[in-house]
């Protein structure tokens, strides 16, 4: 059964260091023909914590589908684990909790996971060796590529403007924070009625 959503939110996310992030934007639209509208950030510029608080506070107003443009989990099938060789949980929700406990970074940041705690899994430049050795994709991304959808980014690539690594691991901290209020698909069942968080990252 598909939930009957009456409102839709798209969140342009950021993994940048710091407390507030000009790269974050939140758009909202209702069913019907009206154009989406931008949601003003508290204080003029969004923080990741602001987004989490906003989602939690608005999710109960009306059934809303919240979409985030980051990867909800690293590849698992391709490598037999999220961070093979390291002792980490083997399912999404427990892994999000692990990331949140591990990272002392400001405003739900997660750069320390990539740069220190699990550094060997991430490509930061030529000193790390052959980049192709880090280019692991999730099963859905491999299918997307095989179908001609284009080359997906991987959370293990931590260099360049197009990298999604820092944003994705920061996003996992948000998922851990909001999961008690709003289910997160496909890790949680679809609600019969109510709000839901999904990934819209490709």
Task: Tell me what each language-model feature is.
Residues 2-9, 13-202:
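RNase H-like (RuvC/DEDD) metal-dependent nuclease/polynucleotide-processing core
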């Amino acid at each position: 059964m598909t939930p009957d959503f009456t409102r839709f939110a798209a969140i342009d996310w950021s993994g940048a260091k710091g407390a507030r992030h000009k790269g974050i934007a939140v758009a909202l639209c209702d069913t019907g023909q009206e154009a989406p509208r931008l949601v003003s950030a508290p204080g003029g510029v969004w923080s990741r914590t602001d987004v989490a608080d906003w989602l939690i506070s608005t999710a109960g107003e009306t059934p809303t589908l919240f979409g985030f443009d980051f990867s909800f989990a690293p590849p698992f099938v391709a490598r037999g684990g999220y961070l093979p060789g390291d002792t980490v949980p083997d399912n999404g929700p427990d892994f999000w909790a692990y990331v949140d406990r591990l990272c002392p970074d400001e405003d739900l940041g997660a750069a320390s996971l990539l740069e220190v705690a699990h550094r060997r899994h991430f490509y930061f430049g030529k000193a790390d060796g052959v980049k192709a050795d880090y280019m692991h994709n999730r099963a859905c991304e491999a299918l997307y590529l095989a179908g001609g959808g284009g080359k997906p980014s991987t959370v293990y690539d931590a260099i360049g403007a197009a990298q999604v690594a820092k944003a994705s691991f920061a996003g996992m901290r948000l998922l851990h924070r909001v999961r008690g209020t709003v289910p997160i698909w496909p890790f949680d069942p679809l609600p019969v009625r109510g709000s839901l968080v999904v990934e819209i990252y490709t």
